[in-house]
Amino acid sequence: MESTLKDIRDGASVLDLDPKATVGGGVEDLYGEDFATEDQLVTPWTVSVASGYSLLRDPRHNKGLAFNDKERDAHYLCGLLPPVVSTQELQERKLMNSIRQYQVPLQKYMAMMDLQERNERLFYKLLIDNVEELLPVVYTPTVGEACQKYGSIFRRPQGLYISLKEKGKILEVLKNWPERRIQVIVVTDGERILGLGDLGCQGMGIPVGKLSLYTALGGVRPSACLPITIDVGTNNEKLLANEFYIGLKQRRATGKEYSEFLQEFMSPVKQNYGEKVLIQFEDFANHNAFDLLAKYGTTHLAFNDDIQGTASVVLAGIVSALRLLGGTLADHKFLFLGAGEAGTGIAELIALEMSKQTKCPIEETRKKIWLVDSKGLIVGSRKDSLQQFKKPWAHEHEPVKDLLDAVKVIKPTVLIGSSGVGKAFTKEVIEAMASCNEKPLILALSNPTSQSECTAEEAYTWTQGRAIFASGSPFDPVEYNGKTFVPGQANNAYIFPGLGMGLVISGAIRVHDEMLLAASEALARQVTQENFDKGLIYPPFSNIRKISAHIAANVAAKAYELGLATRLPQPENLVKYAESCMYSPVYRSYR
């Protein structure tokens, strides 16, 4: 065996390498892959050296027709493949041509998931090189439909399913996962999937999709990523009655049973993977999301993308839009439709940044921000009946029953939708915004597209082309009065991959609000005048890896500044360091 394990760096045998976790975008491979450059030979290890038919069935090492003649001979592949030798670039062109033949987005999603299951590097090569085209396929809005139909399209397990049946043995379940050095976990309980509600165990599509973006956009190694679904039941009657439903067929656990089960999950995660594993809470219902973040944000490297990631990306859009609107954050007035995780999270980060800029207490800067929920404007007279996370936004004002009246009374310069209620920004609402603003900033953030508060065409048309618009789901360019408007997408994918990479490369042990502000500032700086000329307040996704490297560097710098980083000494050039740590999907040559 030792004869096959050749020295790969500085004359050191791979058997003598220190098996510590790397500081880069993944876990350390003791058998050479993490140390090898793209032109060096690596050994395709699984439990043993993969060869023959098993190598073709191993998605991490399979290259399909790109195995050259020498590799086919050395790894017993002769006869198992047609004789032609392809390149990765040719494979990419062929697959993109095939995917473009599908008319139904869900078919494209399934084609991409099939590719991920058989050829991991080619999957990420496609996604990185065609990110603007494929991002809506592998994530929002298509992933929402995929989750709704997950039971029917389920083929091969991806990630860990931890249900109430595993109570008392969660550590054992975690140890069943084949990778030991996990750096990023995305976990959901499926109760609030996008704007689609309780999808129970079928919410697994969200962690899987998110982690594919951590790799493609942020450069975190796939083997360092772990998607997890916590199955505590579902209250979705259609799923409970569906014979194809893949989860527990019982109503959701709540209260003490739920909190104890989550505690039993969080403790062994830290025990098994260490203090520096990032745990991203995803699509938990409001009543649990805030409690979990408050409880575990001080004891774990925990992050809620719906609360913190959304807030960071929206703040970045607002900060960049100020170059079009003029003034500072404190010069503007904000009105939200939706006072859940996203709405209150965005509002709090805006208030925090405003407080930082003006040196005013956050209690004062919050007064520039108003929220509307299902019962109307959140005001002081409602304070006793409000959930705890809404109370900071209960300002003194007469009751206002609906959004239109709130716009007329508050006269905001920025209107933000995070309600999950499609078409909530009516013509009257947007016209009211246009009547009191030369350039109203309208952010319709709810996903998927069907739940968006308004479309790009509606925003531009009803404001006579004066709106600055961005949305949570993608919209096509709009022609109005001979001018083409390109709507921006306030997609969390701008933030969380770079944020995660920044936490990984710095070895951070906690997520601090200052890191979220640092991520926002880095993203806002990437918007160019050319982008503004097209009406964009976010940079194009085609540059996402460069954007993520700058975000990672800014986040890591803040971690070092706050004393929360453990990877010492601090690299001199954090941007270059982040880029060097990013996973490359280019095929490796096998010895």
Swiss-Prot record:
Where does it localize? Cytoplasm
Keyword match DNA damage: no
The catalytic activity, as recorded, is: (S)-malate + NADP(+) = pyruvate + CO2 + NADPH; oxaloacetate + H(+) = pyruvate + CO2
Site described as Important for activity, located at: 306
Record-level GO cellular component terms: cytoplasm
The residues that the entry says bind a divalent metal cation are: 282-283, 306
Q: Name one GO molecular function term.
A: oxaloacetate decarboxylase activity
Q: Which residues cross the membrane?
A: none
Q: How is this protein named in the record?
A: NADP-dependent malic enzyme
Organism of derivation: Vitis vinifera (Grape)
